[in-house]
Amino acid sequence: MKKITSFTIDHTKLNPGIYVSRKDTFENVIFTTIDIRIKAPNIEPIIENAAIHTIEHIGATLLRNNEVWAEKIVYFGPMGCRTGFYLIIFGNYESKDLIDLISWLFSEIVNFSEPIPGASHKECGNYKEHNLDMAKYESSKYLQILNNIKEENLKYP
């Protein structure tokens, strides 16, 4: 079988950051998949389930309610390896184009004080597994990277 693109990235050299994972075109519409890498793979501890679940709920809600980006958001969700998230958006974007949006998103999560969106048994298949404090902690650590972003945090190795 042919390797998928994400498996061709050298994860031993991958830093936390914002990366264009791939671009796809369907019926003349470009979709850009963004790798929101929060942890250095196989070096830092992965994000615990309850925190990543909470970031997913808050993040998806905030992105789909963002006045500028809402109509461009296709998907926001966690990576199976639990080192970050994928964001799929309509349009042709580069990593640097998303710095402000992703910085805003994680800043909002750090300051989030409302009930976690979609965290009831009617709205979520695993509604009991959330941890807002850890979601804020992980988001705060990632913001430190975003606030000092370098080229090595924007292009795959």
From Swiss-Prot:
Binds 1 Fe cation per subunit. Keywords: Autoinducer synthesis, Iron, Lyase, Metal-binding, Quorum sensing. Pfam families: LuxS. Signal peptide: none annotated. SUPFAM superfamilies: LuxS/MPP-like metallohydrolase. Fe cation binds at H53, H57, C124. Belongs to the LuxS family. This is S-ribosylhomocysteine lyase. It comes from Borreliella afzelii (strain PKo) (Borrelia afzelii).
